[in-house]
Swiss-Prot record:
Name of protein: Large ribosomal subunit protein bL17
Ribonucleoprotein found in the keyword field: yes
Stored Gene3D superfamilies: Ribosomal protein L17
Domain of life: Bacteria
GO biological process, one term: translation
Native organism: Synechococcus sp. (strain JA-3-3Ab) (Cyanobacteria bacterium Yellowstone A-Prime)
Amino acid sequence: MRHRRRTPHLNKPADQRKALMRALTTALLREGRITTTKARAKAIRATTEKMITLAKDGSLAARRQALAYIYDKELVRSLFEQAPERYRDRPGGYTRILRTVRRRGDGAEMAVIELV
């Protein structure tokens, strides 16, 4: 049952929210470290960890699932090459969220999310 298993809405319609999540996940996997709001960082943590777990699996089905979510085909290829040896001994927890100073314009809580 999925009762009370809500996804963070991030004050956006569903299509914009999905596009934002995909874009932030792609940016994090490409750059290794991004600065965003604390709520967005917490929201993309699960999808980023799922993509890395798929890369550790390395099967064709896992690669196709990752390609369906991540925008960049070359990024998926490099992720599937590097993730198995980089995260071999780590069963999860591939990201770290560090809180930073509030944003000057609106006072939003900011955070840095990075790959461990």
